[in-house]
Amino acid sequence: METQFLVSGRNSNIHCRIDSISSSSLTPKSSPVSTSTPTLVVFPPFKLVSKSLRTRSKPRLTVCFVLEEKELRGKLVVASDDDDGAGEVRKQREKEISASAEKLAQKLARKKSERFTYLVAAVMSSFGITSMAVLSVYYRFSWQMEGGEIPLSEMFGTFALSVGAAVGMEFWARWAHEALWHASLWHMHESHHKPREGPFELNDIFAIINAVPAIALLSYGFFHKGLIPGLCFGAGLGITVFGMAYMFVHDGLVHKRFPVGPIADVPYFRRVAAAHTLHHSDKFNGVPYGLFLGPKELEEVGGLQVLEMEINRRTKNNQS
């Protein structure tokens, strides 16, 4: 029986042929067995392998090295470009910061000058109006008592109407603020709701408008005797007192147009200032329109919680 195997590899072939004894032969006899020595060559010789490896690895290593070098050079070029770009961005940012700082310094200097100008105007007007009011009250009653009679009814009417006029001005200002200033006179009042440029604004003309009837009432009451002139004198005095209080609380405390000193430490005035700040925020459709009774207006529309939050915010800002 003859069996033949053929195994083919990548680089070699294996041939094996076996001649065995026939199964019919019972007696032992020597018969030539012809076997061919199998040849197994799985890999090529070591020298060839090492030679092929060397020839293959050298170009590959060289190519990798060249690619890495090119890649490194590219990264260096990109990094250099990034450094140049970062330097330009840094210079541009420094210029912007310097320009912003210069603008801020100019703005602070302008604000300081405006506050000083308004402070001088407020002090002079307050001192002048207060001194004139005190002197006019003194001389008016001293002249009336020259005959030895004390006009009690006239004096009582004067002081009563002074208080009444001051309180009434709050309600007048509240109505006028909503019905006139935020309506037909908005073109003048609008300057008060925009950032102010300069120490004064167009809205300040309303102070002059309110001063005209006060001066007229004071003049008539000062130069005439009797109950009616005394009442007119008191009304003018009340309007004047309200105007001075309005200037210190509204212009000084709320809008910080000049320092007000210990007025800022009065708890109720802090509530008034916070309430008027909410008027400028339009959170309650402009409410409150009044000044000294502003917290009461907010209570009527359910804004007490927001008012307390605004008071706390202003307190933190003042402390910082």
UniProtKB/Swiss-Prot annotation:
<keyword id="KW-1133">Transmembrane helix</keyword>
<feature type="transmembrane region" description="Helical">
    <location>
        <begin position="228"/>
        <end position="248"/>
    </location>
</feature>
<keyword id="KW-0378">Hydrolase</keyword>
<dbReference type="GO" id="GO:0031969">
    <property type="term" value="C:chloroplast membrane"/>
</dbReference>
<keyword id="KW-0125">Carotenoid biosynthesis</keyword>
<keyword id="KW-0408">Iron</keyword>
<keyword id="KW-0560">Oxidoreductase</keyword>
<keyword id="KW-0479">Metal-binding</keyword>
<comment type="function">
    <text>Nonheme diiron monooxygenase involved in the biosynthesis of xanthophylls. Specific for beta-ring hydroxylations of beta-carotene. Uses ferredoxin as an electron donor.</text>
</comment>
<feature type="short sequence motif" description="Histidine box-2">
    <location>
        <begin position="189"/>
        <end position="193"/>
    </location>
</feature>
<feature type="short sequence motif" description="Histidine box-4">
    <location>
        <begin position="276"/>
        <end position="280"/>
    </location>
</feature>
<dbReference type="GO" id="GO:0016787">
    <property type="term" value="F:hydrolase activity"/>
</dbReference>
<protein>
    <recommendedName>
        <fullName>Beta-carotene 3-hydroxylase, chloroplastic</fullName>
        <ecNumber>1.14.15.24</ecNumber>
    </recommendedName>
</protein>
<dbReference type="GO" id="GO:0010291">
    <property type="term" value="F:beta-carotene 3-hydroxylase activity"/>
</dbReference>
<keyword id="KW-0472">Membrane</keyword>
<keyword id="KW-0150">Chloroplast</keyword>
<keyword id="KW-0812">Transmembrane</keyword>
<dbReference type="GO" id="GO:0016119">
    <property type="term" value="P:carotene metabolic process"/>
</dbReference>
<feature type="short sequence motif" description="Histidine box-1">
    <location>
        <begin position="177"/>
        <end position="182"/>
    </location>
</feature>
<keyword id="KW-0934">Plastid</keyword>
<feature type="transmembrane region" description="Helical">
    <location>
        <begin position="152"/>
        <end position="172"/>
    </location>
</feature>
<feature type="short sequence motif" description="Histidine box-3">
    <location>
        <begin position="250"/>
        <end position="255"/>
    </location>
</feature>
<keyword id="KW-0520">NAD</keyword>
<feature type="transit peptide" description="Chloroplast">
    <location>
        <begin position="1"/>
        <end position="78"/>
    </location>
</feature>
<comment type="similarity">
    <text>Belongs to the sterol desaturase family.</text>
</comment>
<dbReference type="InterPro" id="IPR045019">
    <property type="entry name" value="BETA-OHASE-like"/>
</dbReference>
<feature type="transmembrane region" description="Helical">
    <location>
        <begin position="204"/>
        <end position="224"/>
    </location>
</feature>
<feature type="transmembrane region" description="Helical">
    <location>
        <begin position="118"/>
        <end position="138"/>
    </location>
</feature>
<dbReference type="GO" id="GO:0046872">
    <property type="term" value="F:metal ion binding"/>
</dbReference>
<keyword id="KW-0809">Transit peptide</keyword>
<feature type="domain" description="Fatty acid hydroxylase">
    <location>
        <begin position="165"/>
        <end position="292"/>
    </location>
</feature>
<dbReference type="GO" id="GO:0016123">
    <property type="term" value="P:xanthophyll biosynthetic process"/>
</dbReference>
